[in-house]
């Protein structure tokens, strides 16, 4: 184990040696990763022929995220009944070269059966989900699991919820019973409820707990972990990479020249856009540094005060989204891997967002909002910033938890960059409103302005 620990410490020392150049170095590395990905596609090293076929196009959630042919998951179960072999998913190899992960998109309404065919055929025991059903007012994943006393039937698969509980304030753990042709299996699902799309969590702690619990539930079996978010690339890639590095550490396989850049390149060659943004790449460095520091600190008394000696990659998670001018403000002493405390974003009176009805938030100057639980009150927001949301309370509420704001982010979490993607990139559940006639979004408005009094009032 000492050799692996020495490699981990060497990695941290290299980070520390970068000093103030850290931001520029990571930006350059991520730019190189993007360039390599583009070159692989241009040279045909990573092709997407299957996903581009007319019969498969509608099975892709996003038209620009197609599975690589070289590593794509090929379904054989139920093919004799006329079902296709296609699903938007790729295998990713683990530290021992086995097919350790299936990185896939969040199911669409018409690909639910394909998703469960995948789970059943490859013996998946644990599913890691890094998104919500609705995010920023857009449908990001079809619900493929059962709810309490509401079994889900899709094709020949019957899914029943056995129990659900909160692993921590961010992670929901569900135990599902899946029955197919009179055979039943248990499948566990871990859902990260507050990871913003194209952003990062405020701290790695709960994500590391999620990965650790997934491995505990998985046991020593060879079955792959099924990992997905909405597109199955950005957040999915972060989870796969963190677990991959953790397995390197546990199996004492950290090489002396360990490079997170090389690990992400491996992921990218197997699943398109794995670790999708520079912010996610920075967060990945933060997470791995914390993992290594904790391991060194627990393994040997010679590594005392390791947190203070670690590379100052970030003062805290706010570094990822703080303007450079603000970073010049003096901060209290402490290294990157101290206990991270991030100021919470303003709470909102709205509950979790599960429906979009084009109801505007309060206009600017409307005053502060109400408090929910122990969350802070929300200030007035401009009409341009007000999202389209309706207040719909979720079925399961974690005990004593904060109400989440309209963007699906906990008041104790700092929302990351949530800028919408280009037109056509997402499935918008608000796009089906009728433009003529009356409907839920087109009600008769209250008459405005003074009106003449009724004729009866003027009679003598």
UniProtKB/Swiss-Prot annotation:
Annotated region described as Disordered, given as residue ranges: 361-460
Expressing tissues: Expressed in brain, colon and several tumor-derived cell lines.
Biased composition (Gly residues): 364-378
Major subcellular location class: nucleus
Xref: InterPro entries: Prot-tyrosine_phosphatase-like, PTN12/18/22, PTN18_cat, PTP_cat, Tyr_Pase_AS, Tyr_Pase_cat, Tyr_Pase_dom
Keyword Lipid biosynthesis: no
This protein's UniProt keywords: Cytoplasm, Hydrolase, Nucleus, Phosphoprotein, Protein phosphatase
An individual GO BP term: blastocyst formation
Sequence ranges of Basic and acidic residues compositional bias: 449-460
Cellular localisation: Nucleus; Cytoplasm
CC terms in the record's Gene Ontology section: cytoplasm; cytosol; nucleoplasm; nucleus
One Pfam family of this chain: Y_phosphatase
EC annotation from Swiss-Prot or TrEMBL: 3.1.3.48
Modified residues (Phosphothreonine): 393
Domain Tyrosine-protein phosphatase, chain residue ranges per copy: 26-291
Residue positions, PTM Phosphotyrosine: 389, 426
An annotated Gene Ontology molecular function: protein tyrosine phosphatase activity
Active-site residues (renumbered): 229 (phosphocysteine intermediate)
Glycosyltransferase recorded as keyword: no
Role, per record: Differentially dephosphorylate autophosphorylated tyrosine kinases which are known to be overexpressed in tumor tissues.
Family: Belongs to the protein-tyrosine phosphatase family. Non-receptor class 4 subfamily.
Designated name of the protein: Tyrosine-protein phosphatase non-receptor type 18
Species the sequence originates in: Homo sapiens
Lineage: Eukaryota, Metazoa, Chordata, Craniata, Vertebrata
Gene designation per UniProt: PTPN18
